[in-house]
Amino acid sequence: RRRQRQMCIRDRVNAYKESGFLPEWASPGHRDCMVGNNSASVVADAYIKGLRGYDIETLWEALKHDANSQLPRTASGRVAYEEYNKLGYVPNNIGIGQNVARTLEYAYNDWTIYTLGKKLGKPASEIDIFKQRANNYKNVYDPKYKLMVGRSDKGEFNPSFKGTDWSRDFCEGNSWHWSFCVFHDPQGLIALMGGKKEFNHMMDSVFKMPSRLGMDSRGMIHEMREMQVMNMGQYAHGNQPIQHMVYLYNYSGEPWKAQYWVREIMHKLYTAEADGYCGDEDNGQTSAWYVSVSYTHLRAH
């Protein structure tokens, strides 16, 4: 397994040397699919957890390059990186869809780049910009709704915002799914939403709301129907942006809720039948969630 991981990272070195960019959805090559700059998190995770046997300096240069570039006509690099670097978010009025999702993912990716750079001993003059940009998730938070909301290049939040709308500001989801996507700074997110009590209220609301199909600004996509069939409010485990959410209760002082919802998800949304997955498998992510949770559950007992 270790050798397989090494090969995956080495493949990224080769891809960068041959094409000038790291692949973000290699199926195959630089497929134009999904958002974010998550080669950064893959590389950082591998190195920080002790995996070696590849050219980390080339990858470091690749991460810095891709954070400030875009490969034309594909999702490799960062779409709208100039606006993101200038404004601290991707605006929703420049013809770039999924802008809130991109902002949240880029902020997380910036944190992973900073963390890797720190591990490599890179100077502050080189890495502090990524530490600063890791806070950019705060720039799409609208205190009026206590949710992440699209905003224009003038700084105006979307005036027709609805939290349940699967709008073009998000990727295959709505604001309730994406507003908790601050993987690197849960305490910062909790503070942003008004503290633990208010944060827990927002988390509880995800499960208490009706499983309404948010088709205010787009037509049906299969993820909507899957969420409705799951019947867990606005919790959409069939798609990845929200799969970590229940664990945030561990950071907000109510860990028993995390335990309850993890068990509910395991028992209700996974079966050994032909339709045993509750949505997209997406390169093994949905099954990996179950395997990881099952392992920790067994060890706890």
Give a label for each model feature:
Residues 4-11, 296-301:
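Conserved small/polar residues in nucleotide/adenosyl-binding loops
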